[in-house]
């Protein structure tokens, strides 16, 4: 009987990507198969996030539930990974001594040996070090699960915003070699992936080493990914205004595979608050980037992150944020009340705002953006939209569910053989959280670009033979 693995994931898309790699790694090394039932699992892994308030307590509550399982089944291995593990590794060992393995985002590739060590020595094992990009060298080949896939192209962040723990939990910015990124995407394309989402804490700061010693910029990488046959839609997240340079904006002019939707966090519309956050841009500079983007791609829609109730935020500061929201006309946002993260400078800033005021401001902000998002959705009524079919509709299994470039879910009638393909649909109805459409044309009637096959791309990337000799085919 195969061994069972359960992974519980909290947090960002990078954590989701890391969890998928943990599953691939443990399957390849030890034959573990995923389960959703904790009682079945031989290994229980918690991949944590420290961005939101009470992240640590949430971890210990979950571990308390798993301890009950371990009491009944002592052989179960419990592991804690992710950003809370990096931040609170010693505290986890003290407060939850029954945890067998503690690992950070950069050491997940060592999971098989850490689990084996904890079992053989009957003692907890912890590795929360930062061995740069080493983890990608030890991961098995990617396995596609559907028509979309995440691909991590860099790790860490070097910006040190005063409210953010990422530099302390994931380390400084480190980019994966260009060849490695392209090889992984080409492998996914061969397995039927049509859309890739390039991931990084500061993804547009990518500077990937090339085989000839040169450096590949993010703009160059986008064009190379777009050239792979089968990859017809590219997203990326999360980007930073400081490095959203003109060469990246130029890619929107000539690369149709790059979607007309961008998540570009601004956090606040107040220059005073941005300075306190150590965000190296002003509201005007942010709007300048958006103007250039809309010149290059007139139909592009923008989303952002916002922090409400940052220490010292006045009513004027908040109104500056509301003005920016209206000026830019954001389509959606991830918005939160400020939550002090231990170890960050902003955690020590004095704050005299009441919780009621913070909640009122968050509500006002979210209502404004929701209204703007609904207006965008209504403008789509009667238009044709190219969508990627993801699977059956969640509400009606006799229908299909697809996604537009601007992240709207569209439900429509169609046959199952369309799953994983692009179709053009006419939008016939608009709802709060989805759209309805009808098929206009299928992929066989489209003129999708084909530049280089996945096999050709893999042949062009740097590989090592059995003796460890690196080769490159130009």
Curated annotation (Swiss-Prot):
CDD domains per UniProt: Radical_SAM
Cell compartments where the protein resides: Cytoplasm
Domain MTTase N-terminal: start-end pairs: 3-120
Record-linked InterPro entries: Elp3/MiaA/NifB-like_rSAM (IPR006638), Methylthiotransferase (IPR005839), Methylthiotransferase_CS (IPR020612), Methylthiotransferase_N (IPR013848), Methylthiotransferase_N_sf (IPR038135), MiaB_methiolase (IPR006463), rSAM (IPR007197), rSAM_horseshoe (IPR023404)
EC top class, as a word: transferase
Chemical reaction(s) catalysed: N(6)-dimethylallyladenosine(37) in tRNA + (sulfur carrier)-SH + AH2 + 2 S-adenosyl-L-methionine = 2-methylsulfanyl-N(6)-dimethylallyladenosine(37) in tRNA + (sulfur carrier)-H + 5'-deoxyadenosine + L-methionine + A + S-adenosyl-L-homocysteine + 2 H(+)
Assembly: Monomer.
Name assigned to this protein: tRNA-2-methylthio-N(6)-dimethylallyladenosine synthase
Native species: Vibrio vulnificus (strain YJ016)
Gene name of the record: miaB
């Amino acid at each position: 009987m195969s061994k069972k693995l359960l992974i519980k994931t909290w947090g960002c898309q990078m954590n989701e990507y890391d969890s998928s790699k943990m599953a691939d790694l443990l399957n390849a090394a030890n034959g573990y198969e995923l389960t959703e039932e904790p009682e079945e699992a031989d290994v229980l892994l918690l991949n944590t996030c420290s961005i939101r308030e009470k992240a640590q307590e949430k971890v210990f509550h979950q571990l308390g539930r798993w301890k009950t399982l371990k009491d009944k089944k002592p052989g179960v291995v419990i592991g804690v990974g992710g950003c809370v593990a990096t931040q609170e590794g010693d505290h986890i060992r003290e407060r939850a001594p029954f945890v067998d393995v503690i690992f950070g985002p950069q050491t997940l590739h060592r999971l098989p040996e850490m689990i084996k060590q904890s079992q053989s020595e009957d003692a907890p094992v912890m590795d929360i070090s930062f061995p740069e990009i080493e983890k990608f060298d030890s991961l098995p080949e990617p396995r596609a699960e559907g028509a979309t896939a995440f691909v991590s192209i860099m790790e860490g962040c070097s910006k040190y915003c005063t409210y953010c723990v990422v530099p302390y939990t994931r380390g400084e910015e480190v980019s994966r070699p260009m060849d490695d990124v392209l090889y992984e995407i080409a492998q996914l394309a061969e397995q039927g992936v049509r859309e890739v989402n390039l991931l990084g804490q500061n993804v547009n700061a990518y500077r990937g080493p090339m085989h000839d010693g040169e450096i590949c910029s993010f703009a160059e990488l986008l064009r190379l990914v777009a050239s792979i046959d089968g990859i017809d839609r590219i997203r990326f997240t999360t980007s930073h205004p400081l490095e959203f340079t003109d060469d990246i904006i130029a890619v929107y002019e000539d690369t149709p595979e790059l979607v007309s939707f961008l998540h570009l966090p601004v956090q606040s519309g107040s220059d005073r608050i941005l300075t306190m956050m150590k965000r190296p841009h002003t509201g005007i500079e942010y709007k300048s980037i958006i103007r250039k983007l809309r010149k290059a791609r007139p139909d592009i829609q923008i989303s952002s992150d916002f922090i409400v109730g940052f220490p010292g935020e006045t009513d004027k500061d908040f109104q500056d944020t509301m003005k920016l929201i209206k000026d830019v006309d954001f389509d959606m946002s991830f918005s939160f009340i400020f939550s002090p993260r231990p170890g960050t400078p902003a955690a020590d800033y004095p704050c005299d705002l009441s919780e009621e005021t913070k909640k009122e401001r968050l509500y006002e902000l979210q209502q404004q953006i929701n209204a703007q998002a609904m207006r965008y959705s209504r403008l789509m009524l009667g238009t044709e939209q190219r969508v990627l079919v993801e699977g059956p509709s969640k509400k009606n299994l006799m229908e299909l569910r697809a996604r537009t470039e601007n992240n709207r879910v569209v439900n429509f009638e169609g046959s199952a053989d369309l799953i994983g393909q692009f179709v053009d649909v006419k939008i016939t109805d608009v709802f709060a959280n989805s759209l309805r459409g009808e098929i206009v044309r299928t992929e066989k009637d489209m003129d999708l670009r084909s530049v280089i096959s996945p096999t050709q791309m893999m042949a062009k990337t740097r590989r090592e033979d059995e003796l460890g000799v690196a080769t490159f085919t130009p």
